[in-house]
């Protein structure tokens, strides 16, 4: 601006011609832009350096769970047996004096379903975390077909487990690719079959591009129930020996829940299933239901046995039945 004003005065006083002023301004512009670009470049380099430091720190992290004691000869075929928990005590590493699990013991044979229920913080997810080997330091052992899971190579163990949390991650790609994420060499028919088992197929067919419909970052364009059913379809397509549903049916309605669980019983007749839930209808058909309180098993049995015991499970069942009935009356 100063250049233009002062240059204008020089032109008015006939010290410079208009052509000379225009040329001068053009030269100044050509000189100033590279200076701005250099400043911008230094800013980008500083930001890049800070990002690189964070990435380098992450890459330098040493995993706490390793295969140091694993038997390399164990294969997935060696894990087709019963799952047995014998946990005397477990505490999180940052609070070693506060046990969160105590005397957790149960056995599941292939084809059986386990239900885990209890209040928030009772220890349901912690039991699952130990099977996934998120923590290895505990008093006791968990065995799969007689083999301590800490002696099974991580890759082999996790290949036999499908885990569906309450809020699973979905990629910003198509529905079909999201379902097929954890499975190799699957075709469209396999994907559709898995979607049918999770009661998602009909919803997908109503979408503009079917299984090619983009879901957005973390399933932004889908409802909570659709996201959960897509995650279940992904797990069913993997067809692992052990399926874990960690409150993974919380966003679906009762009718859809019933259809999904019915499909699971048919498809997984010879495989193990673990269901952690707050809604008791999710576990009512389980072979074994464990009621947890403060990390301990306070009730165990099947649905009918727990109702007959008239403890926490029976009280919660009556309460949830009443809530469901009130909801139905309100809808009417």
Predicted regions and their residues:
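Hydrophobic/aromatic residues in alpha-helical transmembrane segments
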Residues: 3-7, 34, 51, 200
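Small-residue-enriched core segments of transmembrane alpha-helices in multipass membrane transport
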Residues: 23-32
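Cytosolic ends of transmembrane helices, especially the final helix of ABC transmembrane type-1 domains
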Residues: 31-58
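Conserved E/DxxT/N motif and adjacent residues on the DHp alpha2 helix
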Residues: 57, 64, 180
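Pre-NBD coupling/linker segments of ABC/ABC-like ATPases
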Residues: 63-78, 306
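ABC-type nucleotide-binding domain
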Residues: 76-332
């Amino acid at each position: 601006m100063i250049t233009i004003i002062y240059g204008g005065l020089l032109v008015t006083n006939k010290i410079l011609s208009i052509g000379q002023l225009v040329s001068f301004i053009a030269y100044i512009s050509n000189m100033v832009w590279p200076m701005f670009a250099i400043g911008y470049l230094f800013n980008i380099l500083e930001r890049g350096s800070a990002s690189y430091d964070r990435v380098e720190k992450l890459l330098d992290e040493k995993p706490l769970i390793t295969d140091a004691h694993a038997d390399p000869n164990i294969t997935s075929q060696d894990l087709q047996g019963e799952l047995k928990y014998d946990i005397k005590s477990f505490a999180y590493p940052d609070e070693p004096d506060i046990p969160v699990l105590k005397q957790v013991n149960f056995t599941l044979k292939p084809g059986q379903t386990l239900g885990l229920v209890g209040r928030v913080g009772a220890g349901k997810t912690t039991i699952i975390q130990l099977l996934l080997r998120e923590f290895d330091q505990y008093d006791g052992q968990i065995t799969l077909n007689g083999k301590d899971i800490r002696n099974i190579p991580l890759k082999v163990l996790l290949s036999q487990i499908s885990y569906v949390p309450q809020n699973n991650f979905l990629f910003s790609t198509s529905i079909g690719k999201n379902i097929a994420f954890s499975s190799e060499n699957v075709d469209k028919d396999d994907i559709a079959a898995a979607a049918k088992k999770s009661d998602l197929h009909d919803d997908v067919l109503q979408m503009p591009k079917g299984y090619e419909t983009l879901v957005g970052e973390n399933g932004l364009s889908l409802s909570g129930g659709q996201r959960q059913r897509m995650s279940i379809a992904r797990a069913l397509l993997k067809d692992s020996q052990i399926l874990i549903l960690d409150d993974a049916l919380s966003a679906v309605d009762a009718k859809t829940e019933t259809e999904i669980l019915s499909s699971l019983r048919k498809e997984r007749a010879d495989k193990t299933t673990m269901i952690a839930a707050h809604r008791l209808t999710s576990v009512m058909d389980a072979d074994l239901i464990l009621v947890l309180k403060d990390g301990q098993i306070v009730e165990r049995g099947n649905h009918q046995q727990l109702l007959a015991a008239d403890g926490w499970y029976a009280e919660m069942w009556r309460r949830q039945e009443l809530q469901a009935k009130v909801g139905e009356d309100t809808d009417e």
